[in-house]
A protein has these predicted regions:
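Acidic/His-rich, divalent-metal-binding segments that scaffold phosphate/diphosphate chemistry
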Residues: 1-90, 141
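Generic structural signal of hydrophobic/aromatic residues within well-ordered alpha-helices
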Residues: 7-10, 23-27, 132, 145-153, ...
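Acidic-enriched, low-complexity/disordered segments with a strong bias for Aspartate over Glutamate
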Residues: 8, 13, 22, 45, ...
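Divalent metal-dependent catalytic cores for phosphoryl transfer on phosphate-bearing substrates
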Residues: 28-30, 59-159
Length: 191
C-alpha cells in the first residue's frame, strides 16, 4: 500500500470523527505519515468530547481554535517523523513555523508550539483543553493539568474547584475508557 493510500485510509476509516476538511487537505498537501493522520484524528475526536463537556458546564471556549489545535498539534512531525515513535520536542516549534508559512492564523497555529507547555501561568483554557485531549486520548491522566482545567472552569462558573473537578474526573474517566480502541486505530497505520 502506498503512503498516500495509507494516509487516505487514516483520514477516512470509520470509528473516529473526521478531521476538519482544511486540516485533512493540509495533511494531504504535506504528504503526512498515515500514523500522524490517525493520531491527529484520535486527539481531535477526544477534543470534541471535551469541548462539548466544557460547553455543557456553561463555559465558553473558542471551539474552532480548540478543535483546529487538537487536529494539528503535532503537524511538525512531518519534518521530524522519528518523534512519531519516540520522544522529542523539535516538532513543536517546527509545527508552528510550518503553519505560519502556510498562512494559518497565529491564534490557531499556536497550539503546535504550546501543547506540551500547559504548566505556564498564562496558559489559556483553550490551550489546556488541547493538551488535555492529547493526554486522555491514550488513557493518560495528568493530575496537575486536570486540576488547572478544573480551576479555570470553576472560576468561570463561580463554583468550588472540587465540585468541578469531580465532574471533570468522571468525564475524563469515561474518555480514557476508550483509549485502547483509539490506540489500536492509530497503530494500524505506518509511520
Amino acid at each position: 500500500m502506498s503512503a498516500g493510500n495509507a494516509l487516505e485510509r487514516a483520514l477516512a476509516e470509520p470509528g473516529l470523527r473526521a478531521l476538519p476538511g482544511d486540516v485533512a487537505r493540509l495533511l494531504r498537501r504535506l504528504a503526512a505519515p498515515a500514523r500522524l493522520g490517525a493520531h491527529l484524528r484520535a486527539v481531535h475526536d477526544v477534543a470534541v468530547e471535551i469541548v462539548v463537556w466544557v460547553e455543557g458546564q456553561g463555559v465558553q471556549v473558542d471551539r474552532e481554535a480548540v478543535l483546529f489545535g487538537a487536529a494539528t498539534h503535532d503537524v511538525g512531525k512531518v519534518h521530524f517523523p522519528q518523534e512519531l515513535s519516540g520522544a522529542g520536542a523539535q516538532h513543536e516549534p517546527a509545527g508552528e513555523r510550518l503553519l505560519a508559512e502556510l498562512g494559518v492564523e497565529r491564534r490557531l497555529a499556536r497550539f503546535t508550539a504550546l501543547h506540551a507547555r500547559w504548566d505556564r501561568d498564562q496558559a489559556t483554557l483553550d490551550e489546556l483543553l488541547v493538551t488535555l485531549a492529547d493526554k486522555v486520548w491514550k488513557g493518560r491522566r495528568e493530575a496537575g493539568l486536570e486540576e488547572k482545567v478544573a480551576q479555570v472552569v470553576a472560576g468561570a462558573l463561580g463554583e468550588p474547584v472540587w465540585a468541578v473537578y469531580m465532574r471533570l474526573d468522571d468525564e475524563l474517566t469515561r474518555l480514557a475508557d476508550g483509549a485502547d480502541e483509539r490506540l489500536a486505530f492509530q497503530n494500524r497505520f505506518p509511520i
